[in-house]
Amino acid sequence: MNKKNTIILSTYNESLAIENTITELIKHIKNLEIVVVDDNSPDGTFEILKKINYPHLKIFCRKKTRGLASAFLLGLINSEGDTIGWLDSNMGSLASKFPEMISNLNDFDIVLLSRYVHGGGDQRNKVRIIASKMVNYISRFILRSKIKDLTSGIFVMKRKVLLDVL
């Protein structure tokens, strides 16, 4: 039996990136459902999404609510996949990483990419890198977590594990 894979995307003003991101996801992931939650982008992101011809694409446009956490929850509620993934909408170039990440779910409950381990990388400006590292350090200390990059923009996990936690 082939497992269904869901990738959740949250968008706000991603008109320049969203089509490429979805194209890359479709190219690299089998049995794929894509759930996009748009926060009423004024740049036409939602209109672009409506024109994408992919039968397993679900699109939601929120008029008042905003934010990543609530977008993820809305996407999760409306998803059907055995695996649930998240990708920042402007990170389509990383879609090629998902097949290996999904394969690693045979041995792990969650798989994420980290900017802060050997082989990782962060191309943002120095202020954003420092701020991100500080947030991650404080979060790891408070949560007593060994995960190096709690704010990673790409992860995948088993649906069952996620629902057990919720």
Regions found by a protein language model. Name each.
Residues E14-A17, S41, L94:
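Donor nucleotide-sugar binding loop of glycosyltransferases
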Residues E14-K27:
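Short, well-formed alpha-helical segments that are part of the catalytic scaffolds
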Residues D38-E47, M91:
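A conserved acidic beta->alpha catalytic loop
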Residues K51-Y54:
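Short, conserved SAM-binding/catalytic segment
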Residues R62-N78, T83, A95-L166:
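Acceptor/aglycone-binding surface of glycosyltransferases and processive sugar-polymer synthases
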Residues L32-N40, F60-C61:
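Short beta-strand/loop segment that forms part of the nucleotide-sugar
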Residues K4-T6, E33:
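Cell-envelope/extracellular polymer assembly enzymes that use nucleotide-activated donors
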